[in-house]
């Protein structure tokens, strides 16, 4: 039978064909409605013209034509709305059919995966992956510790100097100026063996002096 009457159309093709027919019908209705609206404007203009001329019989006849024309316009609008509603329903059916086809494909893919997956083998692979990950994490931690031991003190000192310089720059000072204004230590840091160390100014005194200078700058 199909060879005599052609290939049987699929549901998707039938939906597309009906959708095209509905769209064509809506375009035809729009054109006819626009024609009637133009005719309505012409009738109104003729009614005004006849009324000015005092031809009331003609005015009454054309008024009836105007009422009929407006009713037709309203019917065309309602008809187009109904066709558009049907078109939307067809579009919904098409979307639902596409969703069903997609779900069907996903179901087949999931069934194939379930048949191919071998749980014991996957568990073994995951255990080996976790073990190798732990070894890599341990090696990375040891390497980071070694690098921190080699470079940590220097980095900390550089960061501290940078912070101090930034603070002094914001206050309009330099680190060399403040250090030169600090009290002298009065000798080297080391003391010879058997020699009594001389009294040194405490660090607290130096900090207090620096703090007092900063406070004076803020008041200025």
Swiss-Prot record:
GO terms for cellular component: ESCRT III complex; late endosome membrane; multivesicular body; nuclear envelope. Residues 211-220 have a biased composition (Basic and acidic residues). It is found in: Late endosome membrane; Cytoplasm. Pfam families: Snf7. The keyword Aminoacyl-tRNA synthetase does not apply. A motif (MIT-interacting motif) lies at residues 208-218. Probable core component of the endosomal sorting required for transport complex III (ESCRT-III) which is involved in multivesicular bodies (MVBs) formation and sorting of endosomal cargo proteins into MVBs. MVBs contain intraluminal vesicles (ILVs) that are generated by invagination and scission from the limiting membrane of the endosome and mostly are delivered to lysosomes enabling degradation of membrane proteins, such as stimulated growth factor receptors, lysosomal enzymes and lipids. GO terms for biological process: endosome transport via multivesicular body sorting pathway; exit from mitosis; late endosome to vacuole transport; nuclear membrane reassembly; protein transport. Probable core component of the endosomal sorting required for transport complex III (ESCRT-III). ESCRT-III components are thought to multimerize to form a flat lattice on the perimeter membrane of the endosome. Residues 184-220 are annotated as: Disordered. It is a peripheral membrane protein. Residues 12-53 form a coiled coil. This is Charged multivesicular body protein 2a. InterPro entries: Snf7_fam (IPR005024). Keywords: Coiled coil, Cytoplasm, Endosome, Membrane, Protein transport, Transport.
């Amino acid at each position: 039978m199909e060879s005599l009457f052609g290939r049987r159309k699929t549901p998707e093709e039938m939906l597309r064909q009906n959708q095209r027919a509905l769209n064509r019908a809506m375009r035809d209705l729009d054109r006819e409605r626009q024609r009637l609206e133009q005719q309505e404007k012409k009738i109104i203009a003729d009614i005004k013209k006849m009324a000015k001329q005092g031809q009331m019989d003609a005015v009454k006849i054309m008024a009836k034509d105007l009422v009929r024309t407006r009713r037709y316009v309203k019917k065309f609008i309602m008809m187009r709305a109904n066709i558009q509603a049907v078109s939307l329903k067809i579009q919904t059916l098409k979307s639902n059919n596409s969703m069903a086809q997609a779900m069907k494909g996903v179901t087949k893919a999931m069934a194939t995966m379930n048949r191919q997956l071998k749980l014991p083998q996957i568990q073994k692979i995951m255990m080996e992956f976790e073990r190798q990950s732990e070894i890599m994490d341990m090696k990375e931690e040891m390497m980071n510790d070694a690098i921190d031991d080699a470079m940590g003190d220097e980095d900390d000192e550089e960061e501290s100097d940078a912070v101090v310089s930034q603070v002094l720059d914001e206050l309009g000072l330099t680190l060399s100026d403040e250090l030169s204004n600090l009290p002298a230590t009065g000798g080297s840091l080391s003391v010879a063996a058997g020699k009594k160390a001389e009294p040194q100014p405490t660090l607290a005194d130096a900090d207090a002096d620096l703090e007092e200078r900063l406070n004076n700058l803020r008041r200025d």
